[in-house]
Amino acid sequence: MIHKTSLPKDVEERLRSLGPALRQCSGVLFGYLFGGATVSPLKPLSDVDVAVYLDDSVNLVEGRLEAIGVVTTHLQTDEVDVVVLNTAPTALTGRILQTRRVIFDRDPFRRHLFESRALREFFDFRIFEHRLLARRYGNG
């Protein structure tokens, strides 16, 4: 995706320390990089995709805003997308989990539980999605 500003030249280095920076967000239980941010080198006009899972006691809007603030400050760019996994659609969650790189994990048991449930739902959903797309667009 083309954005207005280039990523900082040291963004790769900043990505390596993003996990510890997310520790500041007390409501974030775990976080992932996904999409283009998981492959090196990032293109100058790329964005950084981050997914976080928030504790149930945290207001989802406030937790997302706090995570966005920490990520943008740490990376020194506004070219970020932060997804809250608690409310993300099944298709998006599954695609995030397929390319994820764990950058922060405050609760490994909760993360494994989330991943196993979300991937089961996603694989069930994909069967339905493929059938729907085949009916809609045909087989070729």
What are these regions (language model features)?
Residues 47:
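ATP/adenylate-binding site constellation spanning eukaryotic-like Ser/Thr protein kinases
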Residues 1-30, 38-40, 44, 55-140:
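Catalytic core of pol beta-like nucleotidyltransferases
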